[in-house]
Design a protein with these regions (language model features):
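Short acidic capping loops at alpha-helix termini that bridge into adjacent secondary structure
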Residues: 29-32, 63, 89, 194
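Rossmann-like NAD(P)(H) cofactor-binding subdomain of soluble oxidoreductases
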Residues: 49, 57-128
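Internal alpha-helical scaffold of NAD(P)-dependent oxidoreductase catalytic cores
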Residues: 102, 106-111, 127-163, 176-213, ...
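Short pre-catalytic strand/loop immediately N-terminal to key active-site residues, enriched for Gly-Thr
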Residues: 112, 161-166, 218-223
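NAD(P)-dependent Rossmann-like dehydrogenase/reductase catalytic/cofactor-binding core
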Residues: 201, 205-266
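NAD(P)+-binding Rossmann beta1-loop-alpha1 motif at the extreme N-terminus of oxidoreductases
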Residues: 1-55, 61, 125, 187-188
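Small-residue helix-packing motif on alpha-helices
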Residues: 33, 60, 192-199, 221, ...
Length: 266
């Protein structure tokens, strides 16, 4: 357990996921944590967990050694107005599209770590990229311990975060799209909604396990299911004829492009 005073700006879904992860793993004790938000109801729920709450961000800034910015980017500039120069401020941002340099421009002299999480963090099954290069070893370890409680973490330079946004940050939506298509196809062929969903979801869970435990490449896994003259190969042929793989890659590239545009205009 760390003895740092930790502030969390925001009390939305992701902020709550972070807070719950911290409390579940004991990274920081509740009495050392303060959360700010404008919503009294959200703060009341958080207060019941033994955590301090405030509505004034200035109070949070002055009473925290590390501050997690867990708000939407469009809210950020409003929060920045509450900032007054504080020595040795350490910012941990999960805001998409706002770079470390942009944050340093607002928080003069601050050290900044940037995190790119995704929504499965809400269930402790997220994927997080972390750039905490500004922090000393103890600060880095704190950041990694916090976000390990939300899923898997990788250390990566911020210059790759637009790609991370496109692959894992937005990735759950792509997977949901494919899952929905499979469920709908099953229903079109006479399966009930419940059965089609159950079979589809377990297929995804099992396929992920197969990929994680593979001793060969993914292309070989595909070929292992595609018996010549069989059923699977007909579906895979159709995917190839319709350029499914290129369609997916093109969508991911467009996502990366938009992420870069948002960063440049922040």
């Amino acid at each position: 357990m760390y003895d740092y005073k930790l502030g969390i700006v925001g009390a939305g879904n992701m902020a709550n996921a972070i807070l719950n992860g911290i409390l579940r793993t004991g990274v920081v004790s509740p009495e050392k944590i303060v959360v700010s938000d404008i919503d009294d109801k959200k703060l009341e729920i958080i207060k019941n967990q033994g955590v301090n709450t405030v509505k004034d961000n200035k109070v949070l800034f002055k009473n925290s050694e590390f501050i997690i910015l867990a708000v939407k980017p469009q809210v950020a500039k409003v929060i920045f107005r509450d900032f007054e120069k504080i020595e040795n401020l350490k910012i941990i941002s999960i805001m998409a599209g706002i770079t470390k340099d942009t944050l340093k421009g607002f928080f003069d002299g601050a050290k900044v770590a940037r995190i790119m999480p995704n929504t499965p963090c809400l269930l402790g099954e997220g994927a997080c990229a972390i750039d905490a290069g500004d922090f000393d070893d103890d600060g880095k370890t704190l950041v990694f311990d916090i976000f390990k409680s939300l899923g898997k973490v990788v250390e990566l330079d911020e210059k790759y975060f637009d790609a991370v946004t496109a692959v894992s940050g937005s990735g759950p939506a792509y997977v949901y799209t494919f899952i929905k298509a499979m469920i709908d196809a099953g229903c079109d062929m006479g399966l009930s909604d419940k059965i089609s969903e159950e079979l589809t979801l377990q297929t995804f869970v099992g396929a992920v396990k197969m990929v994680e435990n593979r001793t060969t490449d993914i292309e070989t896994l595909i070929k292992n299911v595609c018996s010549p003259g069989g059923t699977t190969i007909e579906a895979v042929k159709s995917f190839k004829e319709n350029n499914l793989e290129e369609i997916i890659k093109d969508g991911i590239r467009k996502c990366e492009k938009r992420s870069k545009e948002l960063s440049e205009n922040a």
